Design a protein with these regions (language model features):
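Bacterial Sec-pathway N-terminal export signals of envelope proteins
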Residues: 1-32, 36, 141, 190-227, ...
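Transmembrane beta-barrel architecture of outer-membrane proteins
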Residues: 2, 56-58, 104, 149, ...
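A glycine-/polar-enriched beta->alpha junction
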Residues: 5-16, 22-37, 48-53, 61-79, ...
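Periplasmic alpha-helical coiled-coil/stalk elements that build and connect Gram-negative outer-membrane
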Residues: 73, 82, 89-211, 305-308, ...
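Metallo-beta-lactamase
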Residues: 164, 217, 364
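Acidic, low-complexity, intrinsically disordered peripheral segments
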Residues: 183, 360-402
Length: 402
């Protein structure tokens, strides 16, 4: 969680969607604005008035107030509000993507770090095994082939160790980039990976599907875009009906003070806004198809993630059982070695078998965590239901008081 908060603050990708959301909020304010009144006025001159008797000048002032009809303003506000909500959900979607990047890069760093620990342990075991076999070869107890095989395994382990160290360095760079920092910003910082070593949570399939459909930002954003297109269609239909123009006027004609009140509007004779309505209907159909597509892809992604997670957790359970069995064998072999029943070479071979099982368990754990990340990405929610932080609070039922 701490790394995620750092990424939310420093990652530049979020600044882009935040700016887009701010622009959408500005559009919402603009949509709610009322039209300003118009004003005209000026002097006039009556050429038939005798100048000696009375002034021939006429002063007039006319106002023009627009009264919107047929709910145009409310539909315009509704469309802008749905577009603003879609932009807000885009921020949530981008934030989730950043969170997943941080999690994936943290998992890669954990995998490389743990692999280094296991490979260094195996390296010590391989070196001991090569040393013991060299002594037995010198004593004529084994053939050179056995020592050559041990040295090949030792060399392969060294190569794997060097590769793991390279992966660790690359993972630190990738993690720093996901956080929006330089790699040197992570120098001297101890990162905890306890979350990756916890038992995999059991996630009911029905709850996962429900959470995905109710919580995924892309699904909700597609729904908001459809609602916005619906409001735009209503707005275009309402524009068939003209607005009313109310025009009070005042005129000072010599000694006569006159006022007037005009009513005006556009006659919808030649243009009934059919073209704009047809375009809005097509865009609404497009938004509906887009929502259906996004929802179908979400369901497909959830089903695939559930299957992958189920298989990965089963493999991890088998790896745990295998490591437990190898640990029992190692303890038994250590007791036999202490009693002088087996040689140090035989004990080293069993220890290498245990190290290999631990490596397989690490790989299984990484695959399980990757599958869990894929499942979380399908839901766009953390796997622990109690820790869902992207859920809309308004959708959460209130707690009943007793």
């Amino acid at each position: 969680p701490a790394l995620t908060l750092v990424a939310f603050f420093y990652n530049p990708d979020l600044d882009i969607v935040r700016s887009q959301w701010a622009a959408a909020r500005g559009s919402l304010v603009a949509a709610g604005g009322r039209p300003n009144p118009g004003v005209t006025g000026g002097p006039g001159y009556n050429a038939t008035t005798p100048v000696a008797d009375i002034t021939p000048w006429i002063l007039s002032l006319n106002l023009d107030f627009t009264i919107t009809t047929a709910g145009k303003r409310s539909n315009q506000i509704a469309a802008a509000r749905h577009q603003s909500e879609s932009a807000r959900l885009a921020v949530a979607s981008a934030a989730w993507s950043v969170r997943q990047q941080v999690r994936q890069q943290s998992l890669d760093l954990y995998a490389a770090t743990r692999a280094i620990v296991l490979l260094e342990r195996q390296q010590r075991a391989h070196e001991l095994n090569v040393s013991l076999l060299a002594r037995r070869l010198a004593a004529g107890e084994i053939s050179p082939f056995e020592l050559a095989q041990a040295r090949l395994l030792d060399g392969a382990n060294r190569a794997s160790l060097n590769d793991a160290r390279r992966q660790e360095a690359e993972a630190r760079v990738s993690l720093a980039a996901a956080l929006g920092l330089t790699v040197h910003a992570l120098d001297g910082i101890s990162l905890a990976f306890d979350a990756f070593e916890r038992p995999a949570p059991a996630l009911p399939d029905a709850d996962v599907r429900r959470q995905a459909l109710l919580n995924r930002a892309d699904v909700l954003a597609a729904l908001e875009r459809y609602e916005a297109s619906q409001s735009v269609l209503r707005l275009e239909i309402a524009r068939q009906y003209p607005d009313i123009h109310l025009g009070p006027g005042y005129q000072m004609d010599q000694d006569n003070l006159k006022w007037s009140l005009d009513l005006g509007g556009i006659l919808p004779v030649f243009n009934r806004n059919r073209g704009a309505i047809a375009e809005a209907e097509a865009r609404r159909a497009e938004a509906a198809a887009s929502f259906t597509s996004v929802q179908s892809k979400a369901i497909e992604q959830v089903d695939g993630a559930i299957a992958a997670y189920t298989a990965a957790t089963a493999t991890l359970a088998s790896s745990d059982a295998l490591v437990a069995d190898r640990e029992r064998m190692q303890r038994s072999a250590a007791a036999q070695f202490a009693a002088g029943e087996i040689s140090r070479v035989e004990l080293a071979a069993i220890e290498l078998t245990l190290a290999g099982a631990e490596t397989e368990r690490l790989n299984a754990r990484i695959r399980a965590q990757q599958a869990l990340g894929r499942l979380e990405d399908a839901m766009q929610s953390p796997a622990v239901f109690a820790d869902w932080v992207f859920t809309d609070p308004s959708r959460t039922p209130p707690t009943k008081k007793r």
